[in-house]
Regions:
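P-loop (Walker A) phosphate-binding loop of NTP-binding proteins
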Residues: 13
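Conserved phosphate-donor/acceptor-positioning beta-strand/loop module used by diverse small-molecule
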Residues: 99-104, 113-137, 171
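Post-Walker A alpha-helix
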Residues: 21-23
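Post-Walker A helix-loop "phosphate-sensing" segment adjacent to the P-loop in P-loop NTPases
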Residues: 26-35
Length: 193
């Protein structure tokens, strides 16, 4: 009898460190974890690779797949659509790895309605000021985009305070401490599955 591997969802505002934590996890444990690559209609940032960081696609193509029921969640942010296909998750699970997903709170609400039984972890920035500093430090966003991301962050933080929204919350005020906490949570959850 094979053990069902439950996906792990990291959620939180843009700039809270989700991608960095996921990269650390999949680099340290490449045979244990696989990243579910989301689709997006936004343009790639410098150093992002199609098929590795995101599947960069058109609005028409992503909408067709969503309408065909091929996605477990999707959301629109700053005029761009993002989503996770069933295939992306199942491709990782088929390798025998635990699937790691990077999904916003809209997506978390959708994924809770599926049969995936995900471990939901909220990555919280130490403060909105620090989050703004991180977003500005990227140097990839317009002022308007930064303001939209900060507005979205407030909504994400509000949702995270609702009872039952997430199983765990990690404050990412120190990357190494946050990463250690993430590994401890996943280790405990995996042993209970």
């Amino acid at each position: 009898m094979t053990q069902k591997l439950h996906p792990v969802v990291l959620s939180g505002p843009s700039g809270c460190g989700k991608s960095t934590l996921i990269k650390k996890l999949t680099t340290e444990f490449p045979t244990k974890f696989g990243f579910s690559v989301s689709h997006t209609t936004r343009a790639p940032r410098p150093n992002e690779i199609d098929g590795k960081d995101y599947h960069f696609t058109t609005l028409e193509a992503i909408n067709q797949k969503i309408e065909a029921g091929e996605f477990i969640e999707s959301a629109t942010f700053s005029g761009n659509k993002y989503g996770t296909s069933k295939k992306a998750v199942h491709d990782v699970l088929e390798t025998g790895k635990i699937c790691i997903l990077d999904i916003d709170s809209q997506g978390v609400k959708s994924i809770k309605k599926t049969d995936l039984h995900c471990v939901l972890i909220f990555i919280k920035p130490p403060s909105l000021e620090e989050l703004e500093r991180r977003l500005r430090e990227r140097g990839t966003e317009t002022e308007e985009a930064i303001q939209k991301r900060l507005e979205s962050a407030k909504a994400e933080l509000d949702y995270a305070t609702e009872a039952g929204s997430y199983h765990f919350t990690i404050v990412n005020d120190d990357l190494e401490r946050a990463y250690k906490e993430l590994k401890e949570i996943i280790s405990k959850e995996i042993s209970q599955l």
